[in-house]
Amino acid sequence: MENLWFIIKAIIIGIVEGITEFLPVSSTGHMIIVEDLINFKEGVMPASLYTKQYIDAFTMIIQLGAILAIVVLYWDKIKRSFENFAPSKPKSGFKFWLNIAVSAVPAGVLGLKFHSKINEKLFNPGSVTAALIVGAIWMIFAEKRYRGKFTTKDIDNVTIKQAFIIGCFQCLALWPGMSRSASTIIGAWIVGLSTVAAAEFSFFLALPVMAGVTYKSLKDINVFALGSMHIVGLTVGFIVSFIVALIVVDKFITFLKKKPMRVFAMYRILLGIVLIILSLFNVISM
């Protein structure tokens, strides 16, 4: 029964990750909250092996499932970028990946340097709740001010300067609950990208950022010390997050073409209020 409950927990977290990784609602924030609600850490590791590093690694591996969904959905774009890699070619793949690399640097540097401190100080429901509400208010004002006033409709036309500024905004997502997607989309609005282009640039930007974060987490643990059920849980969570993300990303792009982002902002505010109420009844610990 304990093993079954562990698998169910992994499925729940995989679903949450797949839904929230690319939406502007903060996947990390939702993971922290859900893990707290279902007491995920209980029974995940043998007492002799349990450390926070193992839990962090589990979270990162689950997130890789959602990241893989982007590779699958945008495989044609990725393939073309390497076929047209020469800098002199129209829609040069070299220029595209250079932009992604430049954009990834600010958050990558800060994330690697302050990874442990951020996990220690900010990975808790109270911090997430504050970030959800602050980010929602910022999203509402940014959409009103910048959405629709774009000069760049295609991510192949993003400049190095635009890419770097978007990358600087991504640093705000180091605060769990702020949302990497929300931060980068808002940054992209400010430098002139259309909403769809902003979302797609954010998707691709997740690839190197998540690879770096995952490497940082995994190098601190001995994966071979995990039990067979823990490997099964990791695999199940990875597959579930991959499948769910495949569905959500496609629907998200369709949504952005017709609907405003403030829908997600209102959800964030509502969730923040619910979390505050739950904390008052000691359901979660702030």
From Swiss-Prot:
The EC number(s) this enzyme carries: 3.6.1.27
Keyword annotations from UniProtKB, A to Z: Antibiotic resistance, Cell membrane, Cell shape, Cell wall biogenesis/degradation, Hydrolase, Membrane, Peptidoglycan synthesis, Transmembrane, Transmembrane helix
Domain of life of the native organism: Bacteria
Pfam family, one: BacA
One of the record's GO molecular function terms: undecaprenyl-diphosphatase activity
Catalyzed reaction equations: di-trans,octa-cis-undecaprenyl diphosphate + H2O = di-trans,octa-cis-undecaprenyl phosphate + phosphate + H(+)
Cellular localization per UniProt: Cell membrane
Stretches that traverse the bilayer: 5-25, 55-75, 92-112, 122-142, 185-205, 229-249, 264-284
InterPro entries named among the record's database cross-references: UppP
Bilayer topology annotation: Multi-pass membrane protein
GO biological process terms held by the UniProt record: cell wall organization; peptidoglycan biosynthetic process; regulation of cell shape; response to antibiotic
GO terms under cellular component: plasma membrane
Primary location class: membrane
PANTHER family membership: UNDECAPRENYL-DIPHOSPHATASE
Miscellaneous comment text of the record: Bacitracin is thought to be involved in the inhibition of peptidoglycan synthesis by sequestering undecaprenyl diphosphate, thereby reducing the pool of lipid carrier available.
Family named by the database record: Belongs to the UppP family.
Protein name per Swiss-Prot or TrEMBL: Undecaprenyl-diphosphatase
Organism, scientific name: Clostridium novyi (strain NT)
Gene: uppP
